[in-house]
């Protein structure tokens, strides 16, 4: 089949939340989450809303604030809307700090000190013509080893009785590696898989399925996010185009992903179902080489992710793999989250003579993920030129105010603006439907995620404006 070069994508990010009143007093997660969402509930009478940029902002199970981007159809657009969620939640956190008289921390990470994990879920629209089993078989080896190039890094200190206790304390490339339990499954929490198979395409189900990848880390670095998503886009296109990729089906994906996370040489032997072995570096290098060849002949799409956005992705991909060959990661020390954070922790440990389990290092690990623009350590590093950014601040600020103009999100955004201009109206919004409730109301189905216009919604808006 033909590769989808204009692909609908989205990111869902759950944030950790914490509060400090003073050195000895703090509010619990549930209470501080209620404080965080108080302005949302006051304005919209709900803690589950669609924002003016057509994304979804809500309070998830376990007191985790969550942001799901609107539908995007290009790489840089997706990164801008992912970052817009950080800005929206920072504004809410700032208001919550004023309300409670203490600091409110929102952490874009994936684990807490009690061993709980929360996710960054990637969504990619794929053709239903490709059997999910075949797609997963080719994609899993890439996803298991992808942490080499886009992990967020973590100072792992297993608690007694934890499944990863036998590994002992130490730095890992991936935050999520210790928290997945299956390769492919319909579960999301109880038996967390690498690929979730729950069939909710939010599109024509006879044509499309939504590939739901839940193994990835939340990234602070826009550059790392670009590599994470951009490399995955290329692998999906290659699978759809029928590019011959080596068979790296693993004998045990779950054991492999944990071992890879702790090996900074990329040379640990991974057992394959074929009976042979391969190293993570060898697997990533095979996908990288194939992506280079594919991109060289890829036709630039009129809409979607242009080659100009993918070329730097492939360049960085290769440079990270070269660092594993040499053992020197300084060439990417401002671009890859796990490398940036490890450099920071190593400098601090050396300067103060700290052991890996010193709580001061664990605190630095957490503060790296603080989304506060002046307090968060990643943002401090970025201002000092020690962490590279990708997008101009005004691009992200515009994404806060405006829905993506090229997808179904544009229609949802226009509807939201129209109904909120009439405060007395009751309305309902979902990914595929918008509705004005009550007598004289109207409903429109938004079945096509690629369509950025809707005559039905235009008629609803016209009727509202004529009231």
Swiss-Prot record:
UniProt EC number: 6.3.1.19
List ligand-binding residues for Mg(2+).
12, 58, 66
Enzyme class (EC, first level): ligase
Which catalytic reaction applies to this protein? ATP + [prokaryotic ubiquitin-like protein]-L-glutamate + [protein]-L-lysine = ADP + phosphate + N(6)-([prokaryotic ubiquitin-like protein]-gamma-L-glutamyl)-[protein]-L-lysine
MF terms in GO = ATP binding; ligase activity, forming carbon-nitrogen bonds; magnesium ion binding; ubiquitin-like protein transferase activity
Q: List positions binding ATP.
A: 56, 69, 431
Q: Does the keyword Transcription apply?
A: no
Q: Name a single GO biological process.
A: modification-dependent protein catabolic process
One Pfam annotation, family name? Pup_ligase
- What disulfide bonds does the UniProt entry report for this chain? none
Q: Which residues form the active site?
A: 60
What the record says about family reads: Belongs to the Pup ligase/Pup deamidase family. Pup-conjugating enzyme subfamily.
Any extra remark in the record? Answer: The reaction mechanism probably proceeds via the activation of Pup by phosphorylation of its C-terminal glutamate, which is then subject to nucleophilic attack by the substrate lysine, resulting in an isopeptide bond and the release of phosphate as a good leaving group.
Q: What is this protein called?
A: Pup--protein ligase
Phylogenetic lineage: Bacteria, Bacillati, Actinomycetota, Actinomycetes, Mycobacteriales
């Amino acid at each position: 089949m033909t590769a989808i070069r204009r692909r609908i994508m989205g990111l869902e990010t759950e944030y950790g939340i914490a509060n400090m009143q003073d050195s000895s007093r703090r509010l619990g997660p549930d209470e501080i989450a209620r404080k965080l969402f108080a302005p949302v509930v006051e304005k919209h009478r709900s803690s589950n809303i669609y924002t003016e940029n057509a994304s979804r902002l809500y309070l998830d199970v376990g007191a985790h604030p969550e942001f799901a981007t609107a539908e995007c159809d290009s790489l840089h657009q997706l990164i801008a809307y992912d970052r817009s969620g950080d800005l929206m939640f920072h504004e809410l956190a700032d208001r919550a700090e004023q309300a409670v008289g203490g600091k409110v921390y929102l952490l874009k990470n994936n684990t807490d000190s009690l061993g709980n994990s929360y996710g960054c879920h990637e969504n990619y629209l794929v053709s239903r013509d490709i059997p999910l089993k075949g797609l997963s078989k080719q994609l899993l080896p890439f996803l298991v080893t992808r942490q080499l190039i886009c992990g967020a890094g973590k100072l792992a200190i297993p608690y007694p009785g934890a499944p990863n206790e036998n590994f002992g304390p130490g730095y890992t490339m991936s935050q999520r590696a210790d928290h997945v339990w299956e390769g492919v499954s319909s579960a999301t929490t109880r038996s967390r898989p690498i690929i979730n198979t729950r069939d909710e395409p939010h599109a024509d189900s006879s044509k499309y399925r939504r590939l739901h990848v839940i193994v990835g880390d939340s990234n602070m670095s826009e550059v790392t996010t670009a590599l994470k998503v951009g490399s995955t886009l290329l692998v999906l296109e290659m699978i759809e185009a029928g590019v011959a990729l080596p068979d790296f089906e693993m004998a045990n994906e779950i054991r492999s992903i944990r071992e890879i996370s702790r090996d900074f040489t990329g040379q640990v032997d991974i057992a394959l179902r074929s009976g042979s072995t391969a190293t993570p570096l060898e697997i990533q290098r095979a996908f990288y080489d194939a992506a280079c060849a594919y991109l060289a002949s890829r036709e630039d799409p009129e809409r979607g992710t242009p080659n100009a956005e993918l070329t730097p992705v492939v360049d960085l991909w290769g440079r990270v793999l070269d660092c594993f060959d040499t053992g020197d990661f300084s060439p990417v020390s401002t671009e890859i989250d796990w490398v940036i954070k490890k450099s920071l922790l190593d400098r601090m440990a050396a300067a103060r003579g700290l052991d890996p389990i010193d709580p001061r290092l664990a605190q630095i690990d957490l503060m790296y993920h603080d989304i506060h623009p002046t307090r968060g350590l990643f943002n401090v590093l970025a201002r000092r030129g020690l962490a590279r950014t990708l997008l101009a601040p005004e691009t992200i600020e515009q994404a806060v105010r405006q829905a993506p103009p090229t997808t179904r999100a544009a229609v949802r955004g226009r509807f939201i603006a129209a109904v909120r201009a009439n405060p007395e109206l009751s309305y309902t919004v979902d990914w595929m439907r918008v509705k004005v409730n009550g007598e004289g109301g109207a409903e429109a189905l938004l079945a096509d995620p690629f369509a950025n216009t809707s005559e039905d919604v235009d008629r609803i808006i016209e009727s509202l404006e004529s009231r």
